[in-house]
UniProtKB/Swiss-Prot annotation:
Entry binding sites for substrate: 19-28, 110, 137-138, 216, 254, 366
Entries under PANTHER family matching the protein: N-SUCCINYLARGININE DIHYDROLASE
NCBIfam families: arg_catab_astB, PRK13281.1
Protein name: N-succinylarginine dihydrolase
InterPro entries: AstB_sf, SuccinylArg_d-Hdrlase_AstB
Pfam families noted in UniProt: AstB
Transmembrane segments: none
Coiled coil: none
Species of origin: Legionella pneumophila (strain Lens)
Pathway of action: Amino-acid degradation; L-arginine degradation via AST pathway; L-glutamate and succinate from L-arginine: step 2/5
Gene name of the encoded protein: astB
Enzyme class, UniProt record, top EC level: hydrolase
Active site (catalytic residues): 174, 252, 372 (nucleophile)
Known catalytic reactions: N(2)-succinyl-L-arginine + 2 H2O + 2 H(+) = N(2)-succinyl-L-ornithine + 2 NH4(+) + CO2
Assembly, per entry: Homodimer.
Length: 448
């Protein structure tokens, strides 16, 4: 039976803007209050999907969430008509209005953690939508992400959905951005590597914690997901992210490592006690594991964060053993990073034999590279057929979506534009049409 890795990319929403809402995300902070181009952001994302689809990969999308989040404004004390809510928030708490308008759901690597059916005791694909409690603008995504995933993967014969983990600091969960799966191929059972930044309960075993920026993922959350997903404990590793890396802007593990099948591309300063972590991987691997460790002399952590090298997608083309690195254009523009990539591609000791650079500047300026924009869902033929087909990409759908973006998306968005009530109605009109395009039914709150 064929097994595929479905890439589910987030379709960038109309309210994509730069507000610096994410502590520890250096790009987000550095570009706060800049003018964004939502139309360009969405089209760059669509072009990424088109590129991977035309390479022969299975490609889907997750639609944007309803924004602004009027219910969140209400919870925060802004009452009245939608226009009155927006006006009051803009005048008295513009940073809260910005959070309610956030388009950060486009980074679907944080939407959920997914376990392949070949890894689980009941042979079903398991989903846990992330609670994302570390940031207000991300926390609001959790419930709707769960609703979306339950709609798209609704067949209980194949899919198992779990409740969000408790919305507490002790079970803070950031989704698949802190999860890697290593295996001989997508069809084989794998080693599940969960990465966390802090342990909240019990004895604290680590001498160091990040000082400058917060750690987001807890060990308790990662352990709960592994239990709920019925993963074999002998095939699971929990690794602590290097707190020194977190303080340099590595807010998720997918900013400092990337895995695909039997290849693990990782910076030498990614983990606390990294030698032990890699030894565990080698010990558990019943397949020829290839670990490519990039030294700090080749690329520093700060250079990795600036260019998002490790937030590239590493993919295997159908019916081939070779892999392609899908990297942001910022990697090509940095001589040290490009030299490192050229060396990887030229090295016959690893299966990476080509690189493709993507222009994702609008997302990158907010701290999201190629890997941030996609949620990986391993599916066999039956599981792929059992899911909702309307969000699966082909060139015809991409053409329709491109016209939809050109119709509804602004080419410029400033923070002051969030005060314009017309933006709300533009968003609702667009989402109403999108649900028809993707055959999602009345899935948004305003449609019920």
């Amino acid at each position: 039976m064929n097994v595929y890795e479905l890439n589910m990319d987030g379709l960038v929403g109309q309210t994509h803007h730069y507000a610096g809402l994410s502590s520890g995300n250096i790009a987000s902070t550095n570009n706060a209050l800049s003018i964004s181009n939502p139309q360009a952001a969405a089209r760059q994302g669509l072009e990424k999907m088109r590129r991977l689809y035309n390479m022969g990969l299975k490609q889907g999308l997750l639609p944007p969430h309803q924004r602004p989040n009027l219910n969140l404004l209400y919870q925060l004390g802004f009452k009245g008509t939608p226009s009155e809510q927006i006006n009051k928030a803009y005048k008295t708490a513009p940073e809260l209005l910005s959070a309610c308008y956030s388009a950060s759901c486009m980074w679907t690597a944080n939407a959920a953690t997914v376990s392949a059916s070949v890894d689980t005791e009941d042979n079903k694909v398991h989903f846990t939508a992330a609670n994302l409690i570390s940031n207000l603008h991300r926390h609001q995504e959790a419930d709707f992400s769960k609703k979306l995933l339950e709609f798209i993967f609704s067949n209980s014969d194949y899919f198992n959905h779990h409740p969000l983990l408790p919305k507490s600091m002790g079970t803070s969960d950031e989704g698949a951005a802190n999860h890697n799966r290593l295996c001989q191929s997508h069809a084989h059972s794998g080693i599940n590597l969960f990465v966390y930044g802090k342990k909240v309960l019990g004895n604290h075993q680590f001498e160091q914690s990040p000082i400058k920026y917060p750690a987001r993922q807890t060990k308790e959350a990662s352990e709960a997901i592994a239990r709920n997903h019925l993963l074999n404990p002998e095939r699971v590793i929990f690794a602590c992210q290097n707190p020194l890396a977190i303080d340099q802007g590595v807010f998720h593990n997918d900013v400092i490592s990337v895995a695909n099948e039997h290849v693990f591309l990782v910076h030498e300063e990614a983990f606390y006690n990294q030698t032990y972590v890699l030894d565990q991987l080698r010990e558990k691997a019943d397949f020829p594991l290839v670990i490519i460790q990039i030294s700090k002399e080749q690329i520093s952590v700060s250079e990795a964060v600036d260019t998002y090298l490790f937030n590239s997608q590493l993919i295997t083309l159908p019916d081939q053993k070779n892999m392609i690195l899908i990297a942001p254009a910022e990697c090509q523009a940095n001589l040290k990073v490009k030299t490192c990539i050229d060396g990887l591609v030229a090295d016959p000791q690893n299966p990476i034999n080509s690189v493709y650079y993507l222009d994702l500047k609008q997302s990158m300026r907010n701290g999201g590279g190629p890997a941030c924009l996609r949620l990986r869902v391993p599916l066999n033929d039956y599981e792929l057929k059992a899911m909702h087909q309307g969000i699966l990409i082909d060139n015809d759908l991409l053409d329709i979506l491109d016209k939809w973006v050109l119709k509804y998306y602004r080419t410029e968005l400033k923070i002051s534009d969030l005060a314009d009530p017309q933006l709300l109605y533009e968003c609702l009109d667009a989402l109403d049409e999108l649900t028809q395009i993707l055959k999602l039914g009345s899935i948004y709150p305003f449609q019920s």
